[in-house]
Amino acid sequence: MDLYEYQARQMFKERGVPVLDYRLASTPDEAREGARELLAEGASLLVVKAQVKTGGRGKAGGVKLAHTADEAYEKAQAILGLNIKGHIVKKVMIASGADIAAEYYFSILLDRSNRRHLAMCSR
């Protein structure tokens, strides 16, 4: 499966896995409106994230924090159109932020040469 982050979140949500709320935006104005909604619902921190099917978004400038709707607009404006490893950012996800102590990456891959699934986790 080759999914954008927002698609994976939606699948988790539909199956009862708790996920932080988010909005999807194709323009800075949509990002500002989505941020306003999340802030009105109680979010105190927002994360504006490039939606591209590649890793390294944060290092490439595709993940930025915002505290206000206007900041979310500015961050979305900077991210939309960005080229991340050959992928042009056409959408951003504005998500409620969380206070995290540690971050992990988890993936299940198909190892075609051995005809098995491979679980990978890193910190």
Please state what every model-predicted region is.
Residues 20, 29, 71, 79-85, ...:
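Non-catalytic terminal accessory/regulatory regions of metabolic enzymes
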Residues 1-37, 41-44:
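A conserved helix-loop-beta module that forms one wall/lid of the active-site cleft
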Residues 108-123:
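Flexible glycine-/small-residue-enriched beta->alpha junction loops
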Residues 10-14, 71-78, 105-108:
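Alpha-helical scaffold segments in soluble metabolic enzymes
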Residues 19-22, 48-75, 105:
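Glycine-rich phosphate-binding loop of ATP-grasp-fold ATP-dependent ligases
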Residues 40-47, 63-89:
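Active-site cofactor/substrate anionic-group-binding motifs, chiefly glycine-
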Residues 5-12, 41-58, 86-99, 106:
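ATP-grasp fold ATP-binding core
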Residues 65-68, 96-100, 110:
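Short beta-strand-to-loop capping motifs
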